[in-house]
Amino acid sequence: MTRKPGLLAHKLILLALVLSASVTLAYAQGKPIAQLVKTDGKFTFMVDGKPFIILGGQVNNDSAFPDRMERAWPKLKAMNVNAVEYPVYWNEIEREEGKFDFSDFDKILQQARAQNLRVVMLWFGAYKNGAMDWAPNWVKSDVTRFPRVLDSGGKPIRVLSPHSRTTLEADKKAYVAMMTHLRQVDEADRTVILMQVENESGLLGSIRDYSPESTKLFNGPVPASLVAALKKQPGTWTEVFGSRLAEESFTAYYLSSYINEIARAGKQIYPLATYVNTWEGGEDTADAFDSFDRAGEGYPSGGPVSHMLDLWKASAPDIDILSADTSVQPFVNFRMINARYVRPDNPYWSPEAGRTMSGARAFFYALAEYPAIGFGAYGVDGGSGSELAANYVDLGADYRMVNATMPAIIDLQASGKLKAAVADDVIRGKNLIFDRYHLLVRFLAAPNSLTQPPTPAPQSPAFASPPQAPAPAARVLVGELGPDEFLIMGFNAAVDFRPTVGSGFTAAQFLQVEEGVYENGVWKTTNVGRTYQGSFTPPSISLTAQGSIYRVKLMRY
């Protein structure tokens, strides 16, 4: 049985084609450039003129060399990614000032094409994890031309000052050279779809630069444009932001302005969407480093952490997305932190999140609740041997499932009719309420491996066995395709159906149950054309540990 993609998907494709045609005549002859499209207040990422969800895998920080990437590709493919996230190092492409070498850059890009993967490219310039480690040696060694941040005691630290025009111009020159080369070698293929500018930028070791020049700026007035954008009263940084946030806000303004200038210059050459990621800090973060979580101490000062988002949006308009890296956060913290990045002015993209089982749950949750344009896991190439590390297997299973249903998922995101139910530490299930049906998702008992069968669910919640630990692998997506039709997919759960309260109906019945996938946007049954009509009574669907995808039709009576 076949079905065509929904009307919303067609509208998005049409809109993207119109917009891509207007970017510039220079791009009219090949594939349209990847871009973000906002329709009815919701963002969709368009690749080759079609809606796309990034299923990302990021390699380790020092893996972006041709020989190391050769070892990474099998693990990335085993994880079912459709996009690889890898860095480009300033100190590798410009070892000598003004002399650029893109030979490794080209080799890795060709490898990605050979793997049929898209690329999210990360610029490791002046800032990487609150330090300057990937800047060229000629920058690091010339402390006069490229001044370092001074801490409160006047001691220089391992961070370049965001107030240095010389540093900004050098960083920008290298980034523009890279974007110019990228346009030359990738304009026809459009392998690269998204740019990250710097990496977890900020100052680690000091809340701000205490050099005389920077201190003079700090004691002066807040720029009028920022005051107006944030709807505050004029004054010094302390007067406007208060003593607790003044220094971090000061650093955030100058750092965001620095990075925005680089992003803007790159877009003038090749207008790919850009994002900035952050080492999240402050309230609701899980402390993995046994330290006070303060700006400049527990996390780099000045980055787009959640309490600096308004400032960054005001001072960095050429950055399309601000994202939090939450790869070491438990699921409860993931939800609290990332909810703050879901804003009308900010598409949701999580580039570094899925290193554990928590990431697999977080992915389904983000698809439905935010809704995410993409998701990524850091360090996919890690571990010994050639096999994918065990902690990535569950997210890889999620990716496999979403790859098989992506057209429907995107359409459901756009319509707001996609919901998620994911297991937490003590939660045994979740109620999902749609217009005509009330669904109860019950999480099945915990297997330790995707190869083990789950414990059968009780026949009725009213006669359930005593509480057991919920399966950490239990996660479900449910989408309402029509008034009486649902897409159900997930792992280790059972889904029960009843009519909604007040509907005038007391029971539900399946008319048709199909297992299947989407191929080129068209639903295809995988159970050899058979449908299950009398096999699910009362109406309940069980999802296996290996994962199940169903499309069901019901009636109420």
What are the roles of these predicted feature ranges?
Residues E261-P271, M308-P407:
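Catalytic-core region of carbohydrate-active enzymes that cleave or remodel glycosidic bonds
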Residues T144-W312:
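Polysaccharide-binding and catalytic clefts of secreted carbohydrate-active enzymes
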Residues S63-L76, S301-S315:
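Short, acidic/polar
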Residues F364-G502:
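Aromatic- and carboxylate-lined catalytic core of secreted/periplasmic carbohydrate-active enzymes
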Residues K11-S22:
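Bacterial N-terminal signal peptides
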Residues A28-V81:
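N-terminal carbohydrate-binding accessory modules
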Residues A457-P470, E485-Y557:
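C-terminal beta-sandwich/jelly-roll accessory domains of carbohydrate-active enzymes
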Residues M69-D142, S256-I269:
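Aromatic-lined substrate-binding rim segments of carbohydrate-active enzymes
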